[in-house]
Each structure stands twice: as C-alpha cells, then as structure tokens.
C-alpha cells in the first residue's frame, strides 16, 4: 500500500511546520502539495521530509512560481493524480470535476479554498484544506492510500482546535519593516 499525504495552503514564511504535519509527512511514501507554500523556505522544509510533488499557488513567492508548474499529473501505482491549486473560482465542484476530466485523472487534488472537501464519483476530488489557516473548518490535511489500483482518500483533522491555530498563527507574528509586530490573524 502506498500512502500519500496531500496538503495545500500552508502559507508559512520562516515559521516552522506544525509537528503533527511533520509526523504525518514522515509516515507517508509521498507528499503532494497543491500550492501556496508562500515561501521557498516552506517548500524546502517539505523536501527535507520526503519525496514531494507540488504545484505553485496564487500566493506563492516568485521563486516558487519559477520552480513549480501551475498544474501537473503524476502516476502512482497506475493511478493518475492531477495536482492544481485553483480548480475553480467558486465553492461548487463544477470546476474541479471538469478539470479532472480534462486532465484525464482518476484523482484531482486541489487547494485555494482552505476548506477540506472529498467528493467521490467517477473521479475522486480532494481539497485537503489548510493545516495552518483554515477557513470555516478545522485545520486539516488529506491522506490517500493506494492499494492494488484502488484508492481511498480521507481528511485528517489536526489535533489543535481552530482557536488553537489562531493562537499558533498569532504567535508567528511577523516583524514589519517599521519594526511593528504584525499578526497573521486577528
């Protein structure tokens, strides 16, 4: 069985990855990231944790955008997996369904919404949510398991409640050029 950790929207600069994400990444055979690392430092942190396949997102740095494509297709154990950041400009799944069909993939992993979604139909659509900056949901990632051409996908809600992640984000306050502290979330 092949285990794939799917993430998106980590939105970290110089901040450290949450320990729970590090642990899940170390236990996976492959990490896939659907964009919005934000910084090259975050991308490099994931590369140190294991094999990674990734695309860039709309909030990524110019360095990331030069390094990574906007979309890609990978094949794992005869399963075609599409990876893209923005699959739609709305909250419905019409865009992701069309994109999965156009990319001719059995699984589409996408980001941008910061909200976890799994839709099982003729294709598996997965948005892992965000492990650090969720929107109207708990912090999350997704785990894909491929076994003999069968694939299962599940959302993993991370241990800290949403309020804990707001606190975590605020502890990662950034210094602005004028020396004043700038909170990531109010």
Predicted regions and their residues:
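Short amphipathic alpha-helix with an adjacent loop that forms part of the alpha/beta core around
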Residues: 18-24, 75, 96-101
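Helix-adjacent hinge/juxtasegments
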Residues: 53-92
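Beta-strand-turn-beta hairpins that frame and shape the catalytic cleft
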Residues: 1-5, 73-82, 120-125, 146-155
């Amino acid at each position: 069985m092949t285990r794939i950790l799917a993430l998106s929207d980590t939105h970290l600069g110089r901040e450290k990855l949450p320990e729970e994400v590090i642990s899940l990444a170390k236990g996976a055979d492959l990490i896939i990231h659907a964009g919005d690392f934000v910084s090259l430092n975050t991308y490099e942190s994931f590369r140190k944790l294991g094999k990674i396949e990734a695309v860039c997102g709309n909030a990524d740095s110019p360095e990331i955008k030069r390094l990574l494509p906007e979309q890609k297709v990978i094949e794992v154990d005869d399963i075609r997996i599409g990876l893209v950041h923005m699959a739609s400009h709305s909250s419905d799944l019409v865009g992701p369904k069309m994109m999965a069909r156009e990319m001719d993939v059995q699984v589409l992993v996408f980001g941008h919404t910061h909200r976890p979604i799994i839709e099982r139909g003729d294709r598996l659509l997965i948005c892992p949510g965000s492990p650090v900056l969720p929107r109207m949901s708990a912090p999350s990632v997704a785990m894909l398991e491929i076994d003999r051409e069968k694939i299962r996908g599940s959302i993993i809600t991370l241990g800290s409640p949403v309020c804990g992640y707001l606190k975590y984000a605020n502890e990662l306050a950034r210094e602005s050029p004028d020396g004043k502290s700038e909170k990531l979330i109010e």
